[in-house]
């Protein structure tokens, strides 16, 4: 960016979930990260100290609520309270990954809707806006009574695959719920789509049932919003190869990659897994199959547009 916001009323702060991404976002905007200290009392309570004035400022707080999820949520809520009491003009939450998004409805009797609870907590604490990326369930936007800017990772992922110039591509959704996402990528790549029909007998366990679409001899690109234990995506990749696909790539916006995920990916038929840095990838989760793309330019541009009262939808329409 040629513009500089270093001396403006726009301030960007980072908490502990993804400081590298926050720093890249600030660099894209043309400013420095705001100064604050996040520490703990001996019993684990979170303590936050703002080390510069935010009075009258439009503040953007970067915090993905990834693991440890509850710790990062409490940091965020306490930061919002600190900013509110310090007379910030507006408190804007930049949450690339929205934790608890998979608990967006009552799948069974007597279950909570935790995604709604998190929304209530953020709003009640004093946030004025949320900027997020590829919510697991887009209807979570309706859990808030404040503005939500819902960015999409498909343009970033699609651009990467366009530059690879792959032959005879088919974009595949690993389940019926991801068809809309797969179609958006397929439209950008001018490719057909396929769907994997699966049954999930219990959480984090998936069974491949049927492949819808002609994949014989094609280069398949699996796309999902979240890869957690990688059971679904690796079973899907193996099934695609067994049914005639030439090679399989996979991509996702949010690389949770918990438990046996890396081992499964390394041992699978996936040639390359393309992710974004909405969730930081620690060294112990490194794999030669993984390529990480930055969402900092997208989020940075969204922040600028919000601050300048410009349209954000142009970033993904």
From Swiss-Prot:
At which positions is Mg(2+) 1 bound? 136
Where is it mainly found? cytoplasm
Subunit details: Homohexamer.
Q: Give a yes or no for keyword Signal in this entry.
A: no
Keywords on this record? Answer: ATP-binding, Cytoplasm, Kinase, Magnesium, Metal-binding, Nucleotide biosynthesis, Nucleotide-binding, Transferase
Recorded hits in PROSITE patterns, A to Z, give: PRPP_SYNTHASE (PS00114)
GO biological process: what's one of them?
ribonucleoside monophosphate biosynthetic process
The cellular location(s) given in this protein's UniProt record come to:
Cytoplasm
Q: Where, by residue number, is the active site?
A: 198
Checking PANTHER family in the record gives:
RIBOSE-PHOSPHATE DIPHOSPHOKINASE FAMILY MEMBER, RIBOSE-PHOSPHATE PYROPHOSPHOKINASE 1, CHLOROPLASTIC
Role played: Involved in the biosynthesis of the central metabolite phospho-alpha-D-ribosyl-1-pyrophosphate (PRPP) via the transfer of pyrophosphoryl group from ATP to 1-hydroxyl of ribose-5-phosphate (Rib-5-P).
Residues involved in ATP binding: 43-45, 102-103
**Cofactor binding annotation:** Binds 2 Mg(2+) ions per subunit.
Residues that coordinate or bind Mg(2+) 2 = 175
This protein's name: Ribose-phosphate pyrophosphokinase
Q: Where does D-ribose 5-phosphate bind?
A: 200, 224, 228-232
Annotated family: Belongs to the ribose-phosphate pyrophosphokinase family. Class I subfamily.
NCBIfam families attached to this UniProt entry: PRK01259.1, PRK02269.1, ribP_PPkin
Specify the enzyme's EC class, one word: transferase
The protein's GO terms of the molecular function aspect are: ATP binding; kinase activity; magnesium ion binding; ribose phosphate diphosphokinase activity
> Which pathway does the database say it acts in?
Metabolic intermediate biosynthesis; 5-phospho-alpha-D-ribose 1-diphosphate biosynthesis; 5-phospho-alpha-D-ribose 1-diphosphate from D-ribose 5-phosphate (route I): step 1/1
Q: Which InterPro entries match?
A: PRib_PP_synth_CS, Pribosyltran_N, PRibTrfase_dom, PRTase-like, Rib-P_diPkinase, Rib-P_diPkinase_bac
Cofactor(s) required for function per UniProt: Mg(2+)
